[in-house]
């Protein structure tokens, strides 16, 4: 399996690789994320919200022979763990991607004290603390210049309660008013469904994210199809199933996201 750099990574720490046929991703991770994915099967309520996984990636020389030097160096640097995931952008011509981190508390219970202090400071100074969510990256299509506009994690940290809706609007920067309204409505409906499923799941999701995706190339003035509108739960390294505990820390962020998307829709 030949690999290349994944060009649509909106946020995250490790460089993701993608197969030459664009069907699967190789995502660097830690052991706890590999272990958590092993517990995700079609018997769980959140199954459809989690990208399909195909097990742990065990690299061989065949995986990286012949790819460009940058991707080769990345692949060789994966001395730890990596997991094989479906590429939810597969067959999208112009995917637009937004990564949003959920929760006011951003650290797992086993995090050392210094990490807790650092992440608590991040939460207090951003919308993570006030709203329970924070935009960590956006890749949106700029039709005027025929290129992508990127919004970074650092940019997301500058947003406040008063302008975060405007920040969300950047995800739809090249859409017409009607396209944007229908996309926002589609994502709003998905968020409401996700909220219901999450509220019925005994799970703890610390520092997880929601990935929003749509294909700009599929839009047209009469757009009404949701097949290229995707919402997925990602970054599950610090997730665990619980016996009888609902994750209110994450739900706060989801509820506020629903409110903000409703405001986006109302503004149209």
UniProtKB/Swiss-Prot annotation:
* Signal peptide (UniProt feature, chain positions): none
Which reaction is the catalytic activity of this chain? 1D-myo-inositol 1,4,5-trisphosphate + 2 ATP = 1D-myo-inositol 1,3,4,5,6-pentakisphosphate + 2 ADP + 2 H(+); 1D-myo-inositol 1,4,5-trisphosphate + ATP = 1D-myo-inositol 1,4,5,6-tetrakisphosphate + ADP + H(+); 1D-myo-inositol 1,4,5-trisphosphate + ATP = 1D-myo-inositol 1,3,4,5-tetrakisphosphate + ADP + H(+); 1D-myo-inositol 1,4,5,6-tetrakisphosphate + ATP = 1D-myo-inositol 1,3,4,5,6-pentakisphosphate + ADP + H(+)
Q: Which UniProt keywords apply?
A: ATP-binding, Cytoplasm, Kinase, Nucleotide-binding, Nucleus, Transcription, Transcription regulation, Transferase
Give yes or no: UniProt keyword Metal-binding: no
Any GO BP annotation: phosphatidylinositol phosphate biosynthetic process
Q: Which InterPro entries match?
A: IPK, IPK_sf
Where substrate is bound, by residue? 127-135
Q: Indicate the principal place this protein occupies in or around the cell.
A: cytoplasm
Q: Name one Pfam family in it.
A: IPK
Listed binding positions for ATP are: 27, 86-88, 99, 235
User: Which family does the record claim for this protein?
Assistant: Belongs to the inositol phosphokinase (IPK) family.
Q: Report what the protein is called.
A: Inositol polyphosphate multikinase
């Amino acid at each position: 399996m030949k690999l290349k750099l994944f060009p649509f990574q909106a946020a995250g720490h490790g460089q993701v690789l993608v197969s030459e046929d664009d069907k699967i991703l190789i995502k660097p991770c830690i052991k706890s994320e590999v272990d958590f994915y092993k517990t995700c099967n079609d018997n769980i309520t959140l199954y459809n919200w989690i990208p399909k996984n195909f097990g742990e990636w065990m690299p061989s020389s065949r995986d990286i022979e012949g790819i460009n030097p940058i991707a080769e160096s990345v692949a060789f640097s994966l001395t730890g763990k990596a997991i094989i995931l479906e590429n939810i952008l597969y067959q999208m011509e112009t995917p637009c991607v937004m990564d949003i981190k959920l929760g006011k508390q951003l650290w797992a219970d086993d995090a050392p004290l210094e990490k807790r202090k650092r992440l608590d400071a991040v939460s207090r100074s951003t919308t993570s603390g006030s709203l329970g969510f924070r935009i960590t990256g956006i890749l949106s299509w700029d039709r005027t210049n025929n290129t992508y506009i990127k919004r970074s994690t650092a940019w997301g940290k500058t947003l406040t309660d008063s302008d975060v809706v405007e920040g969300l609007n950047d995800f739809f920067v090249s859409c017409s008013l009607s396209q944007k309204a229908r996309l926002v409505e589609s994502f709003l409906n998905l968020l409401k469904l996700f909220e219901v499923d999450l509220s019925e799941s005994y799970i703890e999701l610390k520092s997880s994210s929601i990935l929003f995706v749509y294909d700009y190339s599929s839009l047209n003035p009469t757009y009404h199809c949701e097949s290229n509108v995707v919402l997925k739960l990602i970054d599950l390294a610090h997730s665990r199933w619980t016996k009888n505990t609902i994750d209110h820390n994450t739900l706060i962020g989801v509820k506020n996201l629903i409110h903000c998307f409703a405001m986006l829709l109302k503004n149209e």
